[in-house]
Amino acid sequence: MPTVTWDHIHLRSPDPEATAAWLQDILGGEIIRGPGRIDVKLGGANVFIAPVNASDGVNSPPVTPYQGLDHFGLTVKDIDAVAAEIKAKGVEFTKEPTTIRPGVRICFIRGPQGISIELLERDRKYA
């Protein structure tokens, strides 16, 4: 079996600057400018954000449920405090913080261009 590690997620956005700013302001990412795109270091991986224009012939995001990438998840410490902090910044929650099983609490937020982002907190004693 090959050994793999996460390197990046590549997003396309009609406003890469705004998308990068959101990832920085809401999730604490570090903006790094790359050739032809903006990169954001986030949680040990990179988010590449390339521009897309309406004239590029790109389809709108599909209505859920659909096949393909559904969301990406990020671990946090003290999910309730994080949720309160980002809610105060106006972030839309599609699922409020909840316990899904002992030791695991999650919530879902709506990111730029409707991206679904899961925040989760794991209590290692249940791992």
What are these regions (language model features)?
Residues 1-5, 30-73, 84-110, 123-127:
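Vicinal oxygen chelate
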Residues 9:
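Histidine-centered catalytic micro-motifs
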Residues 19-24, 86, 114:
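Conserved active-site tyrosine of GNAT-family acetyltransferases
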Residues 119:
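Short glycine-/small-residue motifs
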